[in-house]
């Protein structure tokens, strides 16, 4: 897949995901959605978000050590919110930036988010 220049100067790497499309009806992002990955390791999470056919992606992935990886350009519609609505808005994927925070989640003891990771999310 063709790479791109990160939108954020603090993104340390680009791992392009093919799982994205155009924002519907010319929408622009006016909200940010934070998610945690809920997977046992970073490799599995990145594979899930960046492998063709998984129908999942995010604009940014924030690693436990604070590094930020961009996977979808901000101008595109990442597939992170599913069929969703909020405050009367439909198709949240078309009006949001999706940020996946690497964390194993409930099935693996729900560890604390490291301070470097929290600082990176805040800076992003």
Task: Give the location of each predicted region.
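Active-site-adjacent loop/helix surface patches within enzyme catalytic domains
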Residues: 2-123
């Amino acid at each position: 897949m063709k790479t791109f220049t990160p939108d954020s100067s603090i993104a340390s790497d680009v791992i392009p995901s093919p799982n994205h499309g155009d924002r519907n009806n010319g929408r622009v992002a006016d909200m940010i959605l934070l998610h945690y990955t809920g997977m046992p390791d970073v490799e599995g999470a990145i594979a899930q978000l960046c492998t063709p056919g998984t129908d999942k992606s995010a604009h940014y992935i924030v690693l436990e050590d604070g590094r930020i990886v961009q996977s979808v350009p901000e101008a595109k519609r990442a597939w992170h919110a599913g069929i969703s609505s909020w405050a009367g808005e439909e198709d949240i994927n078309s009006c949001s930036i999706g940020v996946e925070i690497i964390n194993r989640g409930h099935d693996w003891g729900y560890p604390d988010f490291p301070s470097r990771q929290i600082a990176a999310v805040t800076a992003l």
